[in-house]
């Protein structure tokens, strides 16, 4: 199964070229939960980034993501390290063994405090896509 990209950022201003920040600020930032939001892309979003006119966005305060975004001057593009319908993986050795030779880079650092995957919500409908 092909997984869609997730945009991770510590700074909402980095999203200006990808999504409508006003809607995102008004809805997602008020929520405050550990949530990934599916939002409509704007006309400036690179076409290779999505196939369905929407993209997943997660604002995070994780120090490793914050440092990466700061050094790159923008958000980072990620995907899930978990296989569909499989147990949540949070051990780097297990990830390296399962995805041997299939991942270009693994950034080593402390994991966040969350014990499960984030909730995924559609920002327009508030529909929960994953709980």
Q: What annotation goes with each model-predicted range?
A:
Residues 1-131:
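Active-site-adjacent structural elements in enzyme catalytic cores
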């Amino acid at each position: 199964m092909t997984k869609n990209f997730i945009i991770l950022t510590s700074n909402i201003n980095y999203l200006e070229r990808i999504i409508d920040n006003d809607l995102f600020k008004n809805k997602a930032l008020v929520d405050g939960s550990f949530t990934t939001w599916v939002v409509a892309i704007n006309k400036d979003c690179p076409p290779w980034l999505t196939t369905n006119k929407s993209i997943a966005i997660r604002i995070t305060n994780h120090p490793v993501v914050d440092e990466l975004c700061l050094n790159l001057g923008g958000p980072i593009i990620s995907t899930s390290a978990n296989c569909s319908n499989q147990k949540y993986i949070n051990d780097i050795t297990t990830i390296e063994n399962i995805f041997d030779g299939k991942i270009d880079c693994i950034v080593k650092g402390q994991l966040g405090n969350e014990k499960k995957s984030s909730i995924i919500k559609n920002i327009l409908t508030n529909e929960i896509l994953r709980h």
